[in-house]
Structures are given as structure tokens and as C-alpha cells.
């Protein structure tokens, strides 16, 4: 079980809604993933006419919708988008994204911290997308964020956990859930994140652009389940080769003495 703010999740796989060929395929893949939390950019929502073709299938699955502020370049823009999301979706949950860099979509740490503090004071449950910066994540926790979402590698890069050393520190030092977001390109990346100690991962591109998104969603679900089981069972601690003394798992001593 994973608890964030006032909600408990049985799935540690969060998903996105972008890049799918059709809304129907999106809904089928998300259902196959077992995800219970799905993020959607406010910039994709038609506030006048609604987005029933996108939102209705998600509601029918009973999935919690997490609007995000993707596209915001400043704290002011992000706060405005969050308020619109609260009105449009009747939710106080928000994924905070501020990335003025339109090429690499890297998060702005200063504006993110500023917006997070403002939104928490307004009663939002804030989940900020941020760089894998242990100091920043501590600051985000201190201002009241419900979780932190550090990147594994740049959005859409599918490069996996390029920031794993920093993620380890974040996981060790923070007492709120850590959700690895961005760069998860294969089920093995998601499994690694859970083995590191992350509480969940958010995956979009790797599922949406797969040749078979539904099958890929199932693969990610299996990877997340395996990662969680591995962590619960107690992983063997790696030993430096320079300090290692090999030990046979099936010694032959007693067998040979029998002869």
C-alpha cells in the first residue's frame, strides 16, 4: 500500500495520458497497467467544451485524475493553472510542473519551490516534478509537498535512471513518498527504481509509443510488482570485488567426504 496525503493506492505505477494514438487505446493501456493515478496536462483541457473523450474513459475506470501544470514557465503561471484545474476537475491534487526550457523540459527549481509553497498554503496536495536534487527535495518537503517527483532522466528520453546516485540520497533523506518521474523507458527501469527504494514511478512515453501499448502496460505492471516484492524480501547487498570472498552456494565438501 502507498499512501499520499489522504489517498491510499495499491498500485505503485502512475501513468500519463499523452502521445496515445486514440483515447480508446489510452484507456485500454491504463486499465492494463493497473494504475490508479493518471496525470493530464491542463493545456490539453478545453475548459469551455470539456474533454469527455479523454476524461470520461478514465472516470469510468475509477481512476484518480492528477492534473498537471505542464507548459507553465513561472510560478505565477503554474499557480493559475492549478486553480483552473481545481475548478475544472473538482480536485485539490496537482502535479506541479514548471519548465521554461522548451527543448529539454528540465524543471526550474526556484520557480517550483516558490509555487509549491504558495499552493500548499492554498490547500493543494502538491506533487512537484523536480530535478534529482536532494537539497531541493528536502526544501519541497519542508514547505509541505505531499510527495516529490524527481526525474530519472530528461522527459521522453527513455534513458532510465541516469540520476540513480542522487535518487538514492533523496530516498534516504526524505520522509515523504518519492515518485521517479521522467526517463523511464523500459520495464527494467521501473523495476530498478522500486529496488532503489522509490515508492512509485510515473510512466507515459514508454507505454504510449510502444507498438502494443496494452502489452507494454502489462509489462510495466509486472515489473513494478517484481520490484516491490524484491524490496520486501530483502535484496542481497552488493559486495565490492576487492573485498569479496567467494562462497559456494552448494559446497561439495560433504559430498566428497562421502566417498
Curated annotation (Swiss-Prot):
PANTHER family: THIAZOLE SYNTHASE. It comes from the Bacteria. It comes from Proteus mirabilis (strain HI4320). It is found in: Cytoplasm. Its EC number is 2.8.1.10. InterPro entries: Aldolase_TIM, Thiazole_synthase_ThiG, ThiG. This is Thiazole synthase. Homotetramer. Forms heterodimers with either ThiH or ThiS. Pathway: Cofactor biosynthesis; thiamine diphosphate biosynthesis. Belongs to the ThiG family. 1-deoxy-D-xylulose 5-phosphate binds at residues 156, 182-183, 204-205. It catalyses: [ThiS sulfur-carrier protein]-C-terminal-Gly-aminoethanethioate + 2-iminoacetate + 1-deoxy-D-xylulose 5-phosphate = [ThiS sulfur-carrier protein]-C-terminal Gly-Gly + 2-[(2R,5Z)-2-carboxy-4-methylthiazol-5(2H)-ylidene]ethyl phosphate + 2 H2O + H(+). Disulfide bonds: none annotated. GO terms for molecular function: thiazole synthase activity. HAMAP family: ThiG (MF_00443). GO terms for biological process: thiamine diphosphate biosynthetic process. Pfam families: ThiG. Keywords: Cytoplasm, Schiff base, Thiamine biosynthesis, Transferase.
Amino acid at each position: 500500500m502507498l499512501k499520499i496525503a489522504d489517498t491510499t493506492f495499491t498500485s505503485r505505477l502512475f501513468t500519463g495520458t499523452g502521445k496515445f494514438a486514440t483515447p480508446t487505446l489510452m484507456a485500454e493501456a491504463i486499465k492494463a497497467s493497473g494504475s490508479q493515478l493518471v496525470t493530464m496536462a491542463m493545456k490539453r483541457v478545453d475548459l469551455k467544451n470539456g474533454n469527455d473523450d479523454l476524461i470520461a474513459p478514465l472516470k469510468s475506470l475509477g481512476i484518480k485524475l492528477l492534473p498537471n501544470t505542464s507548459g507553465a514557465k513561472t510560478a505565477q503561471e503554474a499557480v493559475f493553472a492549478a486553480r483552473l484545474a481545481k475548478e475544472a476537475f473538482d480536485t485539490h491534487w496537482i502535479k506541479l510542473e514548471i519548465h521554461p526550457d522548451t527543448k529539454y523540459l528540465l524543471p526550474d527549481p526556484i520557480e517550483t519551490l516558490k509555487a509549491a509553497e504558495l499552493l500548499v498554503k492554498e490547500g493543494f496536495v502538491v506533487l512537484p516534478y523536480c530535478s534529482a536534487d536532494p537539497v531541493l527535495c528536502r526544501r519541497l518537503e519542508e514547505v509541505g509537498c505531499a510527495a516529490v517527483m524527481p526525474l530519472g532522466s530528461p522527459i521522453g528520453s527513455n534513458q532510465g535512471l541516469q540520476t540513480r546516485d542522487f535518487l538514492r540520497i533523496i530516498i534516504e533523506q526524505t520522509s515523504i513518498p518519492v515518485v521517479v518521474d521522467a526517463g523511464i523507458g523500459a520495464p527494467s527501469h521501473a523495476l530498478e527504481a522500486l529496488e532503489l527504494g522509490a515508492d512509485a514511478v510515473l510512466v507515459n512515453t514508454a507505454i504510449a509509443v510502444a507498438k502494443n501499448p496494452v502489452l507494454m502496460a502489462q509489462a510495466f505492471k509486472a515489473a513494478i510488482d517484481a520490484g516491490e516484492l524484491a524490496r520486501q524480501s530483502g535484496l542481497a547487498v552488493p559486495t565490492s570485488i576487492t573485498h569479496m570472498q567467494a562462497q559456494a552456494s552448494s559446497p561439495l565438501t560433504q559430498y566428497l567426504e562421502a566417498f
